[in-house]
Amino acid sequence: MGPIIVALILIFLLAMALAFIIPVSYILAKYVSEPHTISYQDAYDTEKEKGFLEGYDSLEKEEIMIPSFDGYELHGEVILREGLKESEGIEESDGRNGSDGSDGSHGRNGSDGSDESHGAGSKERFVILTHGYTYNRLGSVKYMNLYRKMGYSCIQYDLRGHGANAKCPVTMGLKESRDLLAVIDWVHERYGENIILGLHGESMGSASQTLALREKPRVDFVVNDCGFAELTEVLRGQLSKRFHLPAFLVSTASILNKIYYKYSYQEVRPVDALKENQVPICFMHGREDTFIPYQHSELMAETTKGYQEVHLYEDADHALSFEKHPKEYEENLKAFLEKVLG
């Protein structure tokens, strides 16, 4: 076989390989950054069937809109703790009015049976709840119920490209973390500095809040449920396990993702944001998580410089720790908050 024939064969094989690699990599990039998201109705039906929406419809909720760093509008809702009205018991500030035009005067008394009491000299407690990839804020209601029982006021919102927000590409935590910083600032502007503020996120919501810690936001605690430490490792695992495709395609997909969506997968490393972090973190993760293995939480716990706890839940797949072990989850959450807040 002459050298010309060999060269032609090699060129043909290379062309065939590229004909496979490039389209598949593009499909992967599009799948990651433009995912099919769950509708409110489907999420509502799912959460209701699981029993997580009991009493939710009767709660008084204020719809809010918070402009992010790039002008993108984030939609969400505020649910104050039982017995609290914005016209009393919350430190006033110049930025009290909501960015959605609200005058901040709406009273919202809950009805969840919370028996927590707040003395006149105690700080009001707030938590920002961030849902996971492809879902919407209704996925946070199960955690909202826990915090309301402990006397917290809750802010839950839709990630960009999800829920009630305008459609746009997802950046797996990069822009989403900056969105969360805008929500944190909004809470402080409306309710003042003399409050306790925490973050509780699930999956990509967890990754977003971990990335936000790099900017040292004004928060007092973080609860990370099934978050990832490195996006690349998650995608490699999924490509191999779910689609039985070679892991190297993640690298080529990342190149195309950078071209089309302006970020590479290698940039999304929440673990790096913890190298100087001092905010206490509670890591929650299912031992049987097939999407983001629990070792991601263990790696982040080893990396953070602040106080940390890791709680692993038996027989729990991705984002199912609370659903599988509600009592244990609630007890661990309460103990963590008592330890770091008193």
Predicted segments with their positions:
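Conserved alpha/beta-hydrolase
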Residues: 144-166
